[in-house]
């Protein structure tokens, strides 16, 4: 009845759906029915309530941060030229809002309206009316050409992003808008319509960061439109979501540093808008994660993560300190989230030993268990590959794959079955990590089972202040080989002499010495491997070392010292490896 391809697809669906909460399935069915049977009959708001202009909505340190504003060129926007995800397009703002030739995430960014801050700020600083006229034109054309409930602009997530941006820039340009009565009526009517529409279309089927953004927008809308009863309702629901989504150590439960920062920004803003200290303790815990993980404001690339999304770690810390008197505390272990940091003088290794994500929401997860990133004096040397796109296809598949991270495959088996853009079928389990002490040396130990229930255990330690040892153990009744990957930052390259060297501008930075390896091969810009995506929509070639081994215990040394490894140190290293081998046999 079913061919092999159909059966495989059915199994993927089965192993994906079985992890969902029953409520998610019910809400998904209800949302589909609502879109067809109810949403088409939603009409524009009639009477618009008075709005609250006694509250400050814009946080200058966040919303007008120069680095953030620099993402949007107000002069290009004057010509209807929009740039997102490193894709620039001159757009027809009458008919181009749902241009299917552009990536889905690009269209979503278009509907977020974050670029309004750049236009509004240019208007305030220059006093040039052309910016106000462009501000009005873009909003009016959106209202005119995006019928209620149709297209990307009425997706609950785009409403959740756009509504705060319209309200905050409304405040920034209030002196002008208050005198422009027709436009004032137009924007307020649309805002109220979007607010009411979102109330009926929250993303309880997806949950996670989407639902958090829904609640943020509804809380702001309730403050703006003076809906006190609804404000309390959404605040109470947010309390429940914080208990679910923010782990004990402060990490957001989707385990993406980027989405963690987005959730942190949402709570900072809600705390600011409500003039309460309701979430100050939660913000402090979350800020501890951001402060500890960030390197020169760059977050580590675990799970879906990239630069140029949200605000920088520095801006978050400065804002929280100014308004809530929070000083972030640095930590090296985040047990609930599964992240661990091994510092050694100028060197810093950050490791992921966590799950792929919540069982019912792994959509932003990558196959990066037991992977790490390594830096020296804040400069990255060994990196994960990042996130290039959310569009399904070979690039989405590659950047989520095990081989795109500094970890190990067993017989080329992925840690988890990632498929489509945001789906995961069978996945890793029993992932765990801890920090131990080995003869006075801090050691990270972690392990996980891939979806075929083959166990990979890894130990990472600084055996000297400038020599890192990585030891891998495989627990599997039958397997042929392992492949371990080391991804080098594009500023560096791998060179083979009589061993592998990491170099920068032809000068040696470190040696890589393989342990129990049968072969090693370098990739760069290959179809299989050798790509790095620092931001969405931007990828470049980088060197990747693939180390193949046929024995249960293998590994490598990264030697930053100026001295080769002497006999005494090598014997000590092999003694450690032998002890790990005994553990694997046991």
Residue ranges: model-predicted function:
Residues 111, 214, 338, 368-370, ...:
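Residues that flank catalytic or metal-binding motifs in active/ligand-binding sites
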Residues 104-283:
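Aromatic-lined, polymer-binding surfaces characteristic
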Residues 76, 238-239, 326, 334-336, ...:
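Residues that act as N-cap/strand-start positions at coil-to-secondary-structure junctions
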Residues 30, 34-37, 41-60, 126, ...:
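Acidic/polar, glycine-enriched structural segments that form the non-catalytic walls/loops
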Residues 7-89:
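Extreme N-terminal leader/anchor segments
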Residues 247, 251-383, 387, 433-443, ...:
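Carbohydrate-active enzyme catalytic cores, enriched for enzymes
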Residues 3, 7, 16, 160, ...:
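CBM-like, beta-strand-rich accessory domains located in the C-terminal region of large
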Residues 46-75, 90-124, 207-223:
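Long, acidic, intrinsically disordered low-complexity segments
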């Amino acid at each position: 009845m079913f061919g092999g391809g159909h059966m495989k697809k059915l199994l993927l669906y089965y192993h994906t759906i079985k992890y969902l909460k029953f409520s998610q399935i019910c809400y998904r069915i209800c949302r589909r029915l609502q879109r067809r049977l109810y949403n088409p009959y939603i009409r524009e708001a009639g009477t618009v309530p008075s709005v609250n202009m006694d509250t400050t909505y814009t946080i200058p340190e966040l919303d007008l941060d120069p680095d953030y504003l620099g993402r949007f060129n107000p002069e290009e926007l004057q010509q209807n030229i929009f740039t997102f995800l490193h894709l620039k397009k001159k757009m027809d703002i009458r008919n181009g809002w749902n241009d299917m030739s552009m990536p889905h995430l690009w269209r979503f960014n278009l509907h977020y309206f974050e670029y309004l801050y750049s236009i509004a700020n240019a208007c305030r600083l220059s006093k040039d009316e052309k910016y106000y006229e462009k501000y009005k034109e873009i909003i009016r054309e959106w209202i005119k050409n995006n019928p209620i409930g149709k297209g990307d602009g009425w997706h609950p997530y785009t409403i959740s992003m756009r509504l705060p941006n319209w309200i905050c820039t409304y405040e920034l340009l209030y002196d002008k808008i208050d005198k422009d009565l027709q436009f004032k009526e137009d924007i307020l009517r649309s805002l109220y319509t979007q607010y009411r529409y979102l109330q009926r279309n929250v993303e309880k089927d997806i949950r996670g960061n989407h639902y958090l953004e829904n609640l943020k927008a509804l809380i702001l809308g309730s403050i703006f439109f003076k809906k006190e009863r609804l404000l309390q309702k959404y605040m109470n629901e947010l309390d429940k979501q914080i208990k679910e989504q923010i782990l004990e150590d402060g990490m957001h439960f989707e385990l993406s540093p980027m989405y963690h920062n987005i959730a942190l920004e949402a709570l900072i803003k809600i705390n600011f808008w409500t003039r309460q200290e309701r979430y100050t303790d939660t913000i402090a815990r979350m800020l501890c994660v951001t402060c500890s993980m960030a390197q020169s404001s760059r977050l580590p690339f675990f799970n879906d993560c990239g630069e140029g999304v949200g605000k920088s770690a520095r801006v978050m810390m400065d804002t929280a300190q100014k308004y809530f008197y929070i000083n972030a505390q640095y930590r090296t272990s985040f047990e609930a989230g599964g992240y661990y940091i091994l510092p050694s003088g100028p060197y810093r290794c950050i490791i992921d030993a966590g799950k792929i994500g919540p069982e019912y929401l792994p959509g932003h997860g990558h196959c990066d268990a037991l992977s790490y990133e390594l830096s020296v004096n804040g400069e990255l040397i060994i990196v994960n590959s990042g996130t290039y796109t959310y569009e399904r296809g070979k690039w989405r598949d590659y950047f989520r794959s095990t081989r795109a991270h500094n970890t190990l495959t067993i017989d080329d088996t992925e840690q988890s079955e990632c498929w489509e853009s945001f789906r995961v079928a069978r996945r890793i389990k029993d992932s765990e990590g801890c920090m131990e002490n080995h003869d006075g040396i801090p050691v990270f130990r972690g392990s996980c089972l891939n979806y075929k229930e083959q166990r990979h255990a890894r130990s990472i330690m600084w055996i000297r202040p400038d020599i890192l040892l990585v030891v891998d153990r495989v627990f599997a009744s039958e397997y042929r080989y392992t492949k371990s990957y080391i991804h080098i930052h594009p500023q560096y390259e791998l060179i083979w002499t009589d061993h592998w060297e990491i170099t920068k501008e032809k000068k040696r930075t470190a040696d890589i010495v393989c342990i129990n390896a049968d072969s090693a091969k370098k990739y760069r810009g290959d179809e299989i491997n050798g790509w790095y995506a620092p931001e969405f929509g931007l990828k470049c070639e980088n060197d990747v070392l693939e180390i193949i081994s046929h024995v249960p215990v293998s590994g490598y040394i990264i030697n930053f010292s100026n001295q080769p490894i002497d006999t005494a140190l090598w014997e000590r290293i092999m003694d450690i490896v032998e002890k790990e081998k005994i553990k694997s046999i046991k």
